[in-house]
């Protein structure tokens, strides 16, 4: 069975794992997923991730979730631009999450980045997800 929204599936696995207080979750690997995880790691929302290669052309990402005083660092994580409804923004209309306390992750011509990096580089793009 094919998956229509692989990034949305990864975000759901992270959300479900955090709500069940799992130390890590796994998801099939892709370049886009790895770039989104790079942003989440640099912003301090996850401890890190590792790539497990099965040798038959398939690989998996093991994501280490982060907790602070017993509570998940990620309170809310959700997909914004979906396969049926893509959301594109200019640099002037990049949304803020929780008045700047959260981040929006964008896919831009300069790569996948957080909202504040996109504003600094003066570039817009597709709004992938929001994290708080």
Swiss-Prot record:
Gene this protein is translated from: rpsH
Protein known as: Small ribosomal subunit protein uS8
Alphabetical list of InterPro entries matching this protein: Ribosomal_uS8, Ribosomal_uS8_CS, Ribosomal_uS8_sf
Keywords: Ribonucleoprotein, Ribosomal protein, RNA-binding, rRNA-binding
Binding partners and assembly: Part of the 30S ribosomal subunit. Contacts proteins S5 and S12.
Family that this chain belongs to: Belongs to the universal ribosomal protein uS8 family.
PROSITE patterns per record: RIBOSOMAL_S8 (PS00053)
Function of the protein: One of the primary rRNA binding proteins, it binds directly to 16S rRNA central domain where it helps coordinate assembly of the platform of the 30S subunit.
GO terms classed as biological process: translation
Disulfide feature: none
